[in-house]
Amino acid sequence: MDGRTKVYFTSDAHLGSGYHADPRTGECRLVRWLQSIEGDARAVYFLGDMFDYWFEYRTGVPRGHVRFLGQVALMADQGIEIHFFAGNHDVWFADYLEKELGAQVHHEEALVTLDGKTFRLAHGDKEYCGLSWTNRFLYRLFRHPVARCLYAAVHPRWTVGFALSCSLRSRKRGVRKATVGQVPHAYHNEYFEIEKEWLVRWTKAHIEEHPEVDYYLFGHRHLLVDLALRGEKRIVILGDWLQYNSFAVWDGSALWIDQFLEEEDQV
């Protein structure tokens, strides 16, 4: 593990989504990024929605994603810590990633201490569900054991296509939606003052009761945010792999956002 000093955070690749112009190209780009960091990574945290859809049956998982899963397995075999957080698109993790990849799976937010600093890590859908009753209802529904059992009883030939089409429609609606109630809502950074973003407002309230947290990291919102809060405390929203190809890096003393840019991106 000599030379492995950095911790990486990323989210929202939405592998398998029809919103990717070419899903295979998007997956291969993500794999190339993982290959580029495996020499210095001590841990990688995937903060949710790495898959556009994921449901584990007792004896099966969704087809596809083999290049990504294979690369993650190779990194885990080298001793790199791998953490998957459930998002709202891939909420139904069971034990496949733990048994086959050696990953740690988190179904809730987690407090992690790295080099003496406290990180609060979460996908962000739980915090964001306070925005409306529909968000709260769907959050609880998707995590209810009865709902999961009933869903598992339906043949995948129906559920997979249904779930992916719902995801695509939701994404298209979200791109067009300017607000949710009185709160700004969109999938890009150019639409409003970032101080009004719901997760920023939520974090400012949370930090008043939890001053021990140094860094808040979220996915979910498809925004690139690195905002100072109080003192050296910060909130980071990780962007995505649909438009930003973004991630965050902790090197033991500093945290920053970066993007995986290849030659064609820099022309």
Residue ranges and their predicted role:
Residues 258-266:
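Short, solvent-exposed aromatic-acidic interface loops
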Residues 11-14, 49-50, 88-89, 124-125, ...:
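Active-site metal-binding loops of divalent metal-dependent hydrolases
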Residues 2-6, 10, 15-114:
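Core catalytic region of metal-dependent phosphoesterases/phosphodiesterases
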Residues 124-201:
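Active-site-proximal loop/helix segment associated with metal-binding centers of metalloenzymes
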Residues 52-75, 170, 184-213:
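N-terminal short leaders/motifs
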Residues 250-251, 265-267:
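Lipid deacylating catalytic domains
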Residues 16, 91, 128, 244, ...:
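Flexible, glycine-rich phosphate/dinucleotide-binding loops
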Residues 100-107, 118, 125, 129-137, ...:
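Conserved beta-sheet core of the metallophosphoesterase superfamily
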